[in-house]
């Protein structure tokens, strides 16, 4: 069963409001829009001093009604399929910066009411793909991936200057061209244009329709060449109605480089990967769960080969081995970096699941080789279970104007209707959430990766030692030695700290027992995931999942009758006097035990492995007395933090790995291949495996 859909009254903006915030460009006819897109693509090859290789990155200032984006994606899709253009097999990344977040419901309303797609029916398929990806009205970047990674769209919603200034630049793949939409051109100022320049190649061009002279001057003053397209483009070829001005001022280009250097220095405590590997040189991954599987997929979408070393005989035998797991975002009253990251990550994971599920259902030979993922986006209903938890939940609900697609408050009657069983208390409903089978998710990701790149999996291969020799990593298992690998990722869950190189990572294992209870009587009618003191899923293959225990430093990982009873007790405490609770039968002693690796701040760990010994040695050197405290702070703020070159960490997913793991893997894959990231600096700092030490050192505190 599936929960009732969210209420339409949750959406507050009507068409007149939307068309005011997201107006169409001056080029409104199908011909003029196509001409503009062809012009943009042709300029990529004629303006650039370097050939387009691997990845083309384009920027867009404003979303408008979205037609410019749709036209670009449609043309790129068509041309890469026919391979008649210079970009050939090159992938496309479009980074759109829009101050006013919009969701799929409002986008559809905008397109339907304006009838803008009626005369542009060739854009309808890509428009449908955007809508299916369900962009949400949240602050931050949402990464949308299409065509097995050949097309990627980053929607940066929120304050424009913050979005630009907090975005890391990727030296190997800077933005090659900008399109400035008319309705936001007037908002451009010098600080914003210089941040655009920091993120762009030296020969990047800024294109606009009827650009004002002030905008062109701002662009020229930061080293941009400009291309001003006239509205007359609707009458013919765009090249007949444009003004182009090329700027080659070495001083301005030097200023760009200084901006990049300043940004790197300011974020030195969050180091970047040092070197890229050739695509045929595999990235080594130790693991076998959801994190490592999604990393393989993200790498494969970039054409990067990888080799997995898994200690079990198949994927998903660790923490990813549960029959069902809840997937929904972690929200905080402050909507801080943690909350915003989990919203971005949850939506990304949801798109991954839908894309992989679609791949497994296609009537092709390759589809037969992609594992089907059992899942149901039936929503998640969160309620309090005692006075303290209810106060905490109320604070989350009342502290922010949450987008309805993320979560909205429901009263007791609405909760009953959503759950289809008696709840009789108010709650918070996450309409896009639900449950998914983690090990099938992992298998489907690796299946898909194997279709896109050279992927190898070594099962029953427990890595017992890793060593670095001559800037390369070697792995040891039962007398075998694997390597050399220039890049090694440890994504091995509960075994993350088993190697000396990472044994001091500040992360803890927690045992979790999930009970399997038969679907029967009223309990079988449950239509959404319940989260209170513990969680309960709708039935799958005749069983519900009830959990989970949370035991630190567990002495064993066998079935525990006491934890089985405690899981039941949590539901009894959460929903007292409800008849369906009596239908929960744990007498079969059916359960599964796993180990979750948890960090104190609830962020996963993703990035370069810290050289803890070197950090501590430098700490002793720079923290000799109180007078040197300020000097020490400056040192750690401006000096690249010590790392173990070529070694990376992907773990600490805790109990929310289904939400956080895929985006963390995507970001690490982007780092390993030198590509632009969908996360900003503040979030990357929170994810960095060295953060527990550097957080104190940056404040001049003792370790």
Curated annotation (Swiss-Prot):
Its EC number is 2.1.1.61, 1.5.-.-. It comes from the Bacteria. Transmembrane segments: none annotated. SUPFAM superfamilies: FAD/NAD(P)-binding domain. Keywords: Cytoplasm, FAD, Flavoprotein, Methyltransferase, Multifunctional enzyme, Oxidoreductase, S-adenosyl-L-methionine, Transferase, tRNA processing. Its cofactor is FAD. The keyword DNA-binding does not apply. Pfam families: DAO (PF01266). It is found in: Cytoplasm. The keyword Oxidoreductase applies. It catalyses: 5-aminomethyl-2-thiouridine(34) in tRNA + S-adenosyl-L-methionine = 5-methylaminomethyl-2-thiouridine(34) in tRNA + S-adenosyl-L-homocysteine + H(+). Residues 286-703 are annotated as: FAD-dependent cmnm(5)s(2)U34 oxidoreductase. One of its GO terms (biological process) is tRNA wobble uridine modification. One of its GO terms (cellular component) is cytoplasm. One of its GO terms (molecular function) is tRNA (5-methylaminomethyl-2-thiouridylate)(34)-methyltransferase activity. Residues 1-281 are annotated as: tRNA (mnm(5)s(2)U34)-methyltransferase. In the N-terminal section; belongs to the methyltransferase superfamily. tRNA (mnm(5)s(2)U34)-methyltransferase family. Catalyzes the last two steps in the biosynthesis of 5-methylaminomethyl-2-thiouridine (mnm(5)s(2)U) at the wobble position (U34) in tRNA. Catalyzes the FAD-dependent demodification of cmnm(5)s(2)U34 to nm(5)s(2)U34, followed by the transfer of a methyl group from S-adenosyl-L-methionine to nm(5)s(2)U34, to form mnm(5)s(2)U34. This is tRNA 5-methylaminomethyl-2-thiouridine biosynthesis bifunctional protein MnmC. The gene is mnmC.
């Amino acid at each position: 069963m599936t929960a009732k859909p969210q209420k339409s009254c949750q959406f507050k903006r009507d068409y007149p409001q939307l068309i005011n915030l997201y107006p169409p460009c001056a080029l409104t006819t199908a011909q003029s829009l196509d001409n503009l897109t062809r012009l943009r693509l042709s300029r990529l090859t004629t303006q650039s001093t370097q050939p387009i290789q691997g990845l083309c990155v384009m920027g867009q200032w404003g979303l408008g009604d979205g037609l410019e984006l749709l036209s670009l994606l449609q043309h790129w899709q068509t041309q890469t399929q026919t391979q008649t253009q210079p970009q050939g097999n090159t992938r496309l990344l479009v980074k759109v910066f829009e101050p006013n977040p919009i969701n799929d419901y409002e986008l559809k309303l905008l397109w339907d009411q304006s009838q803008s797609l009626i005369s542009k029916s060739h854009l309808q398929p890509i428009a449908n793909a955007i809508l299916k990806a369900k962009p949400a009205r949240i602050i931050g970047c949402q990464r949308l991936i299409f065509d097995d990674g050949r097309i990627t769209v980053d929607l940066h919603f929120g304050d424009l200057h913050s979005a630009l200034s907090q975005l890391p630049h990727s030296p190997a793949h800077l933005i090659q061209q900008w399109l400035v939409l008319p309705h936001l051109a007037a908002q451009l100022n010098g600080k914003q244009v210089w941040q655009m320049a920091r993120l762009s190649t030296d020969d990047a061009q800024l294109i606009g329709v009827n650009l004002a002279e002030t905008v062109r001057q701002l662009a020229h003053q930061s080293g941009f060449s400009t291309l001003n397209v006239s509205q007359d483009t609707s009458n013919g070829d765009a090249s007949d109605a444009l003004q182009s001005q090329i700027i080659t001022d070495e001083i301005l280009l030097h200023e760009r480089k200084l901006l990049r250097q300043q940004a790197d220095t300011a974020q030195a405590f969050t180091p970047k990967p040092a070197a890229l590997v050739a695509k045929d040189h595999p990235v080594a991954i130790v693991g076998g769960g959801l994190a490592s599987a999604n990393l393989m997929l993200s790498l494969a979408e970039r054409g990067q080969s990888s080799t997995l070393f898994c200690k079990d005989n198949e994927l998903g035998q660790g923490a990813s081995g549960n029959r069902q797991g809840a997937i929904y975002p972690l929200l905080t009253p402050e909507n801080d970096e943690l909350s915003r990251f989990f919203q971005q990550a949850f939506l990304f994971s949801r798109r991954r699941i839908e894309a992989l599920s679609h791949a497994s259902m296609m009537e092709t030979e390759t589809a037969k080789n992609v594992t089907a993922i059992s899942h149901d986006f039936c929503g998640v209903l969160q309620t309090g279970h005692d006075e303290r938890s209810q106060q905490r939940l109320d604070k989350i609900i009342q502290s922010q104007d949450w987008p309805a697609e993320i979560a909205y408050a429901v009263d007791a009657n609405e909760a009953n209707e959503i759950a289809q069983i008696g709840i009789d208390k108010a709650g918070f409903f996450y309409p896009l959430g639900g449950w998914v089978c983690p090990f099938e998710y992992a298998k489907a990701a690796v299946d898909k990766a194997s279709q896109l790149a050279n992927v190898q999996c070594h099962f029953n291969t427990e890595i017992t030692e890793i060593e670095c020799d001559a800037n390369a990593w070697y792995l040891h298992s039962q007398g075998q030695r694997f390597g050399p690998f220039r890049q090694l990722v440890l994504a091995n869950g509960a075994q993350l700290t088993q190697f000396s190189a990472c044994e001091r990572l500040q992360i803890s294992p927690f045992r979790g027992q999930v009970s399997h209870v038969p679907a029967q009587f009223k309990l079988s009618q449950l239509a959404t995931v319940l989260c209170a003191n513990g969680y309960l899923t709708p039935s799958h293959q005749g069983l519900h999942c009830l959990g989970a225990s949370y035991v630190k430093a567990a002495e064993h990982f066998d079935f525990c009758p006491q934890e089985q009873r405690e899981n039941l007790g949590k539901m009894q405490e959460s929903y007292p006097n409800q008849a369906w609770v009596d239908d929960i039968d744990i007498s079969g002693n059916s359960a599964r035990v796993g180990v979750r690796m948890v960090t104190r701040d609830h962020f996963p760990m993703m990035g370069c492995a810290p050289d803890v010994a070197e950090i501590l040695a430098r700490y002793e050197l720079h923290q000799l007395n109180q007078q040197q405290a300020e000097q020490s702070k400056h040192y750690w703020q401006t000096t690249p933090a010590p790392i173990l070159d070529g070694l990376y960490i992907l773990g600490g997913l805790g109990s929310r790995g289904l939400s956080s793991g895929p985006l963390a893997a995507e970001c690490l894959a982007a780092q390993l291949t030198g590509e632009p990231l969908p996360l900003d600096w503040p979030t990357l700092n929170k994810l960095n495996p060295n953060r527990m030490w550097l957080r104190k050192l940056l404040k001049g505190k003792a370790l």
